[in-house]
């Protein structure tokens, strides 16, 4: 029990809650980590951001479509990179709504998994093979079980690797980790029975697989019991022999003797308990030889509550101590069940001194080991050290609570001892250093005995307590060196799959991989398919992964459900009654929700719905609870619920500074000072309240100003509760009432004291006296001592006690280790956040020993947060059924309904319109309630289990189960990891002295390379593009293959628009050639005329998507720095300036300063300028038939309004202040040397481009920055051709730019061989002016006029003659260095277009 928590609790807080919390004040940080981990346990990073094409691609399920799966693996990054996410990605992940689906990422390849994971799975595989081999080599004696020989022979021959049921209805597929497909390989050993085949794979590892013939692949194995899974669950074989003996080590080697249970145990155990004992033996012992020579394995005994797990463990321990070398066993149990465990040991295995000397050994066999107990009676360190030392020396079983073990085993507890004595003293404090040293030595001795080396076997009762791997209790348990660990739990999966992983990771460390690997492979696929709004593929993947996880754990998790009880106990009915709020409750709830709505999601309510739940509980249980809290002026966060999931610092604290230590608490053990300081800070420090967003009950004062307490009708829940109590008593049935709120239990007692008891059935008593505590009813909560608890339970269960009819219990204190079969009716007054608690409360009566039909009533306030929490319970229970029990419960709630817990409905249906059909209820008490109080119930009561019906039609067929496991294996292997590209070859080596490079600039420097070592930059990861695409790999030698068809995609325009992305569909009227990249293997990336393209503008940039699925991304480099020189061509008349350069034509240029305040304005994709421009191309194409040869004089660059064409430059480099100043005077003009880097290229003048298609205002080039733009081509899609439309017609009129001043391009835009950012050779020979390939001119250029507008370097392939000024001489090898200098020393996968 968490003593520090209890010590500072108000009387309303149930100490049992803290008993379950078990964390000291030093663990607050760990609880914060737990809360953060629960918010982000999916293991993803950048992929948490919404993928806009997610639903259309449906996560590229590898097992559904291998082709899509391979593509998905290429698009996904590896799990190993998840830790390297940026802060921006983290912020965006946190902003994502909780109810949105998550992207499911693929796991690392299997060879990249942690070695410990592969080792753990391999060891389990080998263990199951050994057991199977033992069954084959040493079959069961035919005389052992009382079953037919035919049935037995079938089981002996066909039982494979701890099968769950008869082989005729069960298949086993052990996961294959070999590199190839092992389904079609391997030796086949066939058995003719039931047409089943047992295959032994011959891959890298031998794996046992069972397959059916083709006729049975689509059949569902519906004969098996779905709630039973694991080994030894065939109760037909779990029987005693003809002599009444129970054999434990079945199929044992001949050199080992038969091991039987003690005679008194053999007479008591049921068939399912025999299976559990054998299951424990197979996992922990396996064989006597292996027990002494190996470290062993752990397992989980996941039997539902009431199936006798304690008896199974006691029986197994008796065998363990008698027949193995085991000496010590540590049993860690909830502190309130310590006495129950000791009583069970004494009952089933009495100590020798308790038996008479002449007792018959064949009837009762005493235990041969001691049972040591460490409880709250052992206060001092010396007393505890004595118990531990006796246990370590004499051997036996040591029983202790979780909190005690944590305190004694963690080393940090040793140094905290002196801090606890920091209270003020009246005089000088004398410290006995010798005594302190002795204390420390004793603590170290205890820790060594408990953990190093620790016991031979560790048993954790209620093992679902190991649900947070960061909590100190879990860490302390994992420090135990023993690998023989047993977890007992009736409810293995409570809240989420990560908690299940924590429990499995305790018994089998690293078996399921790391937390992130488990999240990616199992948790998120299962969660994504849980709700009604999940896609069909999500649901299919959910069923697949649930089955794979269920099968993975089948060898060491034995699950037995309530179906075992149903065959041996009377029937049980659970009814849910949805209750209406009274007027005062509705007013209070409305006001509270309005405060929440005004505060927004950033308030404390939105951040932690459980805090709101604590306040709301006071409203819907009864307004008197809230009224009393208001009178005491308690803070809103001082709830009185025993809720363990409240996260950080949500426990309620006492208003006063007094510390209340319960008799059964561990308050003396734990430091109270820190908690007291925290308590005082809450009370006395207003700023602390504000910082923690603490809200008082001020909002309720006005509504409750005239409130009259003590009226039962103010809460319809309470009215129905007393109806159920009194009617049950009249029928002669005892009843239990569970509530989380201790204040609510107190209010119930106040109303009981005012009401008269009804006359029980068959009683001659008279009605008249009121209820009296400890006479007519009992109350049990966390403050009840262990001895008092045992006395109350025994008296209540006594059939002869006809005075006590009611038992009030707090949900957390009364749901564990309590047997209350004296009652057969239960009322769950309020829904718990954790469905486990309510289920355990129900099972207090529905267990062995119950002789009457059981009726359960769950009261839930409709149209409130409580209803949403109940809905969440159903989802959690459904997930448990899928994973643990392999059931297929029907999904009833959408994810939005589940996650949006603070759902507020202002108006509820009119009570007068509600009609309840009471005839549909066979239960008399409920039927009478519907007749008498129809106005208090919103809907007809329904059965709780009806929401979790097993959908038989959704069960996986045998073929689907194989496909699920095969897909799981393929997915582990096939993901392709992304490796970050290295750009080291683009930068100077460390040994280069930068001062020795003339006029040093990275753009003037190029690395020395061999002839074939061209700089090749890696492609950006495909995830940078919002829409996934399929890369096309086209050979350089086959340019025509660029037009090859690719896999078509359905373009999700509606999802893009819904996400706020602007999508514009444009039909091109002319060919558009996309500039290429240095790493491109495409020789032609072209958008043909008449093709429909989508221009997509999002927050991250602008994209073009072609009809064949290709994506071209355009990124803006941002605004230019203020210090940069921006040039603008001067305005003037035609030919006013002298020619500067010649590349076959004349142009005018005179650089001048451009107004820095006038950047090019961006245009939207549907702007009039763009649409007009496209229309001009359409008009030109229509008139091309009559005008075949555009004239040269119409194509000068001195037209009015032409803006300077863009300049290509590296993204990460600044513009030079003055290029001419860097050229040595003795060199010739550098622009005459410009060419393609490395080997040559095309010289494309800006006259071949229309400026509106080049400048940043074009939607193709537009980015969010609105400034200069650049291409960012994220895949091997580009073509090394340059420019946009190359076809110029005289019919095209030139649009004026945004600048009003007429201008001409500056001189540096008109060189021969205009440099473009490509460092690879496009042609077999090196040329200054290479001819265009003929494929690019396939649109029919004019051929009859030599005076073409196109430069002469097109002549060799287009029938044009070169202009007189065109030079086509090849450059000497040394003349390319200046021409390529501007393109070196940078990231070649980014091309920036900057307007000068």
From Swiss-Prot:
Entries under InterPro entries matching the protein: ARIP4-like (IPR044574), ARIP4_DEXHc (IPR044573), Helicase_ATP-bd (IPR014001), Helicase_C-like (IPR001650), P-loop_NTPase (IPR027417), SNF2-like_sf (IPR038718), SNF2/RAD54-like_C (IPR049730), SNF2_N (IPR000330)
PROSITE patterns reported for this sequence: HELICASE_ATP_BIND_1 (PS51192), HELICASE_CTER (PS51194)
Region (Disordered), start-end ranges: 1-103, 1117-1168, 1194-1250, 1340-1396
Subcellular location as annotated: Nucleus
Domain notes: Leu-Xaa-Xaa-Leu-Leu (LXXLL) motifs are known to be important for the association with nuclear receptors.
Family indicated by similarity: Belongs to the SNF2/RAD54 helicase family.
Protein name (database record): Helicase ARIP4
Biological source species: Xenopus tropicalis
Designated gene of the protein: rad54l2
